[in-house]
């Protein structure tokens, strides 16, 4: 416990809150180019082949981002837009790719929650 005199000399420093998606640099989204598109397996209780992509952002950072929805058209050199948001059962995946933007197509035959997957309104 510091004395009052010590607190006058050197006041308390507020704790620095770090962003959970630092490589976006305070932007809501960032553009990038896919350098590798692959599947990976989730942590212990879950089992699947999750689709992820390694993306080089316009600011030079390289991040791993998740491709949501069923099937995708991404390959190497596809230009994508990413947003923050981690995938709980994939370690190191802290970003999501936005569907229906730039080179990424929306999910086909999607009826509900279409805006999250870039799907057009069905006729």
Curated annotation (Swiss-Prot):
SUPFAM superfamilies: Nucleic acid-binding proteins. GO terms for biological process: translation. Keywords: Methylation, Ribonucleoprotein, Ribosomal protein, RNA-binding, rRNA-binding, tRNA-binding. PROSITE patterns: RIBOSOMAL_S12. Residues 1-28 are annotated as: Disordered. The modification 3-methylthioaspartic acid is found at residue 89. Residues 9-21 have a biased composition (Basic residues). NCBIfam families: rpsL_bact (TIGR00981). Part of the 30S ribosomal subunit. Contacts proteins S8 and S17. May interact with IF1 in the 30S initiation complex. This is Small ribosomal subunit protein uS12. It comes from Ruegeria pomeroyi (strain ATCC 700808 / DSM 15171 / DSS-3). The gene is rpsL.
């Amino acid at each position: 416990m510091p004395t009052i005199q010590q607190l006058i000399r050197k006041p308390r420093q507020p704790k620095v809150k770090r962003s959970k998606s630092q490589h976006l640099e305070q932007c809501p989204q960032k553009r990038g180019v896919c350098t590798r598109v692959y599947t990976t397996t989730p942590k212990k209780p879950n089992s699947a082949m999750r689709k992820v992509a390694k993306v080089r952002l316009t600011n030079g950072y390289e991040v791993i981002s998740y491709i949501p929805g069923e099937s995708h058209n991404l390959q190497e050199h596809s230009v994508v837009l990413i947003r923050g948001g981690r995938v709980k059962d994939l370690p190191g995946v802290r970003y999501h790719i936005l569907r229906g933007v730039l080179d990424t197509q929306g999910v086909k035959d999607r009826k509900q929650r279409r805006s999250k997957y870039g799907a057009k309104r069905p006729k």
